[in-house]
């Protein structure tokens, strides 16, 4: 809490809670991650609180209700997935399946205003057949992630997976990485396009460069606006007017527009 007050006093408007296993925060001290989020959201001067990567099982109905009731909480959910195929998830020893994940995404989208869902997807895990890979592709298309980090499985000596049979070749993994990236990039473009026409608060994080200034909405959509004003470190209402490959373009609202 003292660190939050210190950050607020220094003018920071957004904090991001991160950790190697963020979802397990507080288990050793008798509290829960949502307690830390609530504390951060109610710290004077802190206008935004964002979370790092989360395990899907952490987001119970109770926890979602608490988060949805915090105005300063940023509705960007980076939900661990790894694969969109149940057979692969089972070999990975994941404790959720695609049905659970799908239903969780639906609950998030019904409870939060304009949330974004991001994730990591691995291809080429030992034993991944072409059919399993295609199931993962289809699931990624279905969910429509705002952004995905795609990566190929690599052997780590001493792990259970390293000893599994049916290791894929480098060529197979590279090919699947390329295919998955193509699918998720299309989802990314669709998500950015869906933001056009919306009015969002944007925290500007970079100084002027050729008259363009860059920032992020609460759901972590990157937005670029043209302005002669110094916006870095401040939050402004922006109407999103267009979408590029990896960011949106917007216009600052005038005081009159904000009052309407």
Model-flagged regions — what are they?
Residues 9-130:
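Conserved SAM/AdoMet-binding glycine-rich loop
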Residues 26-41, 45, 92, 155-186:
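Radical SAM enzyme [4Fe-4S]-AdoMet core and its adjacent flexible, acidic
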Residues 163-260:
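Terminal RNA-binding accessory module
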């Amino acid at each position: 809490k003292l660190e939050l007050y210190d950050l607020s006093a220094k003018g920071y408007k957004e904090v991001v809670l991160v950790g190697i296993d963020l979802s397990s925060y507080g288990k050793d001290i008798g509290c829960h991650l949502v307690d830390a989020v609530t504390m951060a959201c109610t710290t004077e001067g802190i206008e935004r609180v964002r979370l790092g990567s989360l395990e899907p099982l952490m987001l119970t109905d109770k926890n979602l209700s608490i988060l949805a009731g915090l105005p300063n909480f940023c509705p960007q959910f980076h939900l661990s997935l790894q694969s969109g195929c149940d057979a692969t998830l089972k070999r990975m020893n994941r404790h959720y399946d695609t049905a659970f994940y799908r239903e969780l995404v639906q609950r998030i989208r019904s409870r939060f205003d304009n949330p974004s869902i991001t994730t990591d997807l691995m291809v080429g895990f030992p034993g991944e057949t072409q059919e399993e890979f295609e199931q993962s592709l289809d699931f990624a298309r279905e969910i429509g992630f705002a952004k995905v980090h795609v990566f190929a499985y690599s052997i780590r000596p001493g792990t259970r997976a390293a000893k599994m049979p049916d290791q894929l070749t480098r060529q197979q993994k590279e090919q699947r990485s390329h295919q998955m990236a193509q699918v998720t990039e299309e989802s990314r473009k669709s998500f950015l396009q869906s933001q056009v026409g919306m009015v969002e608060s944007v925290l500007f994080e970079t100084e002027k460069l050729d008259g363009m200034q860059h920032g992020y909405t609460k759901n972590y959509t990157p937005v670029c606006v043209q302005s002669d004003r110094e916006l870095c470190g401040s939050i402004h209402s922006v109407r999103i007017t267009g979408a590029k490959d990896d960011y949106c373009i917007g216009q600052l609202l005038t005081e009159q527009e904000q009052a309407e």
